[in-house]
């Protein structure tokens, strides 16, 4: 007779608890508390928020701006009036000059490569990529 010297145990039939992938089950906790946003399906993504300082003719203003919101839109949301026209990066009404920091303005098409290198920015199509300082109301200087 043959003897069995080892016994194998399979655990594939044992149920596993799914990993937590959403903050929804936690009561009274919003995604904004953690700098997170939740898309449909419960997937959680991380978004950064940066300090934006705008130097206007009326004095400096500061606010926080998420990296997926245009600077002009967030400034208006914070109650500040800035010049604009097209809101599509196709004109120079919202032109400014970057004094420090970085933005992503790949959605715009008005500024050429030389102007971008010189620090010109269109706030209507600029996402902050770091804490940033921008001198606003510069359309006349840009086109003049």
From Swiss-Prot:
Residues found modified as Phosphothreonine: 136
Cofactor binding annotation: Binds 1 [2Fe-2S] cluster.
A Pfam match: Fer2
GO cellular component, one term: chloroplast
Protein residues bound to [2Fe-2S] cluster: 86, 91, 94, 124
UniProt keyword Transport present: yes
Cofactor (UniProt): [2Fe-2S] cluster
Subcellular location: Plastid, Chloroplast
InterPro entries registered for this protein in UniProt: 2Fe-2S_ferredoxin-like_sf (IPR036010), 2Fe-2S_ferredoxin-type (IPR001041), 2Fe2S_fd_BS (IPR006058), Beta-grasp_dom_sf (IPR012675), Fd_pln (IPR010241)
GO molecular function: 2 iron, 2 sulfur cluster binding; electron transfer activity; metal ion binding
Keywords, ordered alphabetically: 2Fe-2S, Chloroplast, Electron transport, Iron, Iron-sulfur, Metal-binding, Phosphoprotein, Plastid, Transit peptide, Transport
A Gene Ontology BP annotation from the UniProt entry: ferredoxin metabolic process
Transit peptide: 1-47
Keyword Secreted included in the entry's annotation: no
All copies of domain 2Fe-2S ferredoxin-type, residue ranges: 50-140
Family per record: Belongs to the 2Fe2S plant-type ferredoxin family.
Task performed by this protein: Ferredoxins are iron-sulfur proteins that transfer electrons in a wide variety of metabolic reactions. Delays the harpin-mediated hypersensitive response.
Name assigned to this protein: Ferredoxin, chloroplastic
Protein species of origin: Capsicum annuum (Capsicum pepper)
């Amino acid at each position: 007779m043959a003897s069995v010297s080892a016994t194998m145990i399979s655990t594939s039939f044992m149920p596993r608890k799914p990993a937590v992938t959403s903050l929804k089950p936690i009561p009274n906790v919003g995604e904004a508390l953690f700098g997170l946003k939740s898309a449909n399906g419960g997937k959680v993504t991380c978004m950064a928020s940066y300090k934006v300082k705008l130097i206007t003719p009326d004095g400096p203003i500061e606010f926080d701006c998420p990296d997926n919101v245009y600077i002009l839109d967030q400034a208006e949301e914070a109650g500040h009036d800035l010049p604009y026209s097209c809101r599509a990066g196709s004109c120079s009404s919202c032109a400014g000059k970057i004094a420090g920091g970085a933005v992503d303005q790949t959605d715009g098409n008005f500024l050429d490569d030389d102007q971008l290198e010189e620090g010109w920015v269109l706030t209507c199509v600029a996402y902050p990529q770091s804490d940033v300082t921008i001198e606003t109301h510069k359309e006349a200087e840009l086109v003049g």
